[in-house]
């Protein structure tokens, strides 16, 4: 198994002129998780996830606008992608990346997966006193709200109501390769274009076959990763056998 690009595991510098990457890392390190075995249930941020955080949020222009707008992460099972994705949702709904009234979405392939994503976000909140005080959870709607800013985070299934994805500020897509319907995908992508400084993050394991959304996005991500397509706003991170990049 290898990863492309190689900066994920090396010590090369990652630009962070406005400190947004460092703030993102500090937010994750301040989180607590009930399943953590670290002292005081501190969330253990793996070094490669930290590098990814810094690469998403660090590079920015002179005005502080984030360079990256879309992130594609293809990663093997067991890497805690659902937990990391929930943390990103909290960063944008309750942390330094939140905006007043911002709509943040965790979109999964099915209802049970949406519930799993929301449960991870809820676990962070209940174990982290500062977040517990700052938020209101509505379990029946798989939704939480940051009380002071009105920003909210909602988990929805791919076959859910497309109206829920009208104008999101942050979207995390889980396991795109098993999405059967394209309606919500199109609605979310269209909605992101209506709001400034949005972020779309796709986190998935490798899929099978080529007739699906996941393969289409993987194909584009791979072309960016290999330099065939130049798109600084698109960040591909692909874990797969070395032969794939020969």
Predicted regions and their residues:
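Phosphate/NTP-binding elements of NTP-utilizing enzymes
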Residues: 1-246
């Amino acid at each position: 198994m290898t990863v492309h690009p190689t900066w994920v595991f090396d010590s090369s510098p990652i630009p962070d002129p406005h400190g947004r990457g460092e703030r993102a890392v500090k937010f994750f390190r301040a989180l607590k998780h009930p399943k953590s075995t670290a002292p005081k249930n501190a969330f253990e941020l793996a070094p490669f996830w930290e590098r990814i955080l810094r690469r998403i949020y660090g590079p920015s222009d002179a005005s502080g606008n984030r360079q990256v707008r879309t992130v594609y992460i293809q990663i093997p099972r067991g890497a805690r992608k659902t937990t990391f994705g929930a943390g990103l949702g909290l960063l944008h709904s309750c942390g330094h990346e939140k905006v007043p009234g911002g709509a943040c979405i965790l979109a999964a392939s099915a209802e049970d997966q949406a519930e799993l994503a929301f449960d991870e976000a809820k676990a962070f909140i209940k174990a982290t006193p500062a977040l517990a005080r700052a938020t209101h959870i509505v379990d029946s709607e798989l939704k939480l709200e940051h009380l002071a800013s009105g920003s909210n985070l909602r988990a929805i299934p791919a076959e859910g109501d497309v109206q829920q994805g009208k104008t999101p500020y942050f979207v995390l897509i889980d396991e795109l390769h098993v999405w059967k319907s394209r309606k919500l995908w199109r609605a979310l992508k269209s909605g992101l274009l209506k709001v400034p400084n949005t972020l779309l993050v796709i986190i998935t394991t490798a899929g099978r076959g080529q007739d699906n959304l996941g393969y289409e996005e993987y194909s584009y991500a791979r072309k960016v990763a290999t330099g065939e397509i130049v798109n600084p706003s698109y960040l591909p991170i692909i874990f797969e056998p070395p032969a794939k990049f020969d």
